[in-house]
């Protein structure tokens, strides 16, 4: 089955990534288990810098790459060049993904290699691929997320690209772990981090008599990447409108249902406290807080329904 690029194909800066990189047990999954985070990050940057030439060649500008990797403001030029060179060697020696030549004080020359035959140059995939948006680097998520969250973000992008219910898609942790050669713990950790950062939404199925251990994630929804500076501006607006104490209290409630980075939900909680009183709102969130993380009722919709139910019971 050939999966073609969708409507984001014309967006400058989007990066084409093959499913092979994620599924091949010798590549991304191995980087995850070996904690080769910087090699993982650098390889994605190399794909970003690749212009599609037939030789797989890239001129590696250290300053530019260091900026993408979040190293430029943290290290001297000598420091980030050394770190990048170390990751280049890992990509060559441990993963057979590249070949390269270094020149003192100058840009490096890198050649991407084929996944199937390292003796041949890399070529952009014609099927079974997906796109990582430029905002992943532009907004700094490439250096803000944990390694597990980065991997899970790519999984989300890959699956939503083949989903008939886009932007929603479905799978279990067990299936994902087996397919991508990483632990179920890494899947859970990465997905939960993305959920709490408001980068994905998650719905869980209702066990209907089955034990919670048999629960599967019903579906995941990829949400648009936002600029962290935008989020801070939204908090400033709410702080100005309602005061810091009310904002902080609402964010604490929102955290119970993993919406502490969603300004709309936080403001709605503030308004609910105004309309129904803190006692009612607190009771509803206390009920939700007793649910397991993977319980379908550990969500803001359930809290709102609980508040409404309590209000109807006491007209």
Language model features with spans:
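Short, cationic/aromatic linear interface patches
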Residues: 271-315
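Electropositive, intrinsically flexible nucleic-acid-contacting patches
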Residues: 1-274
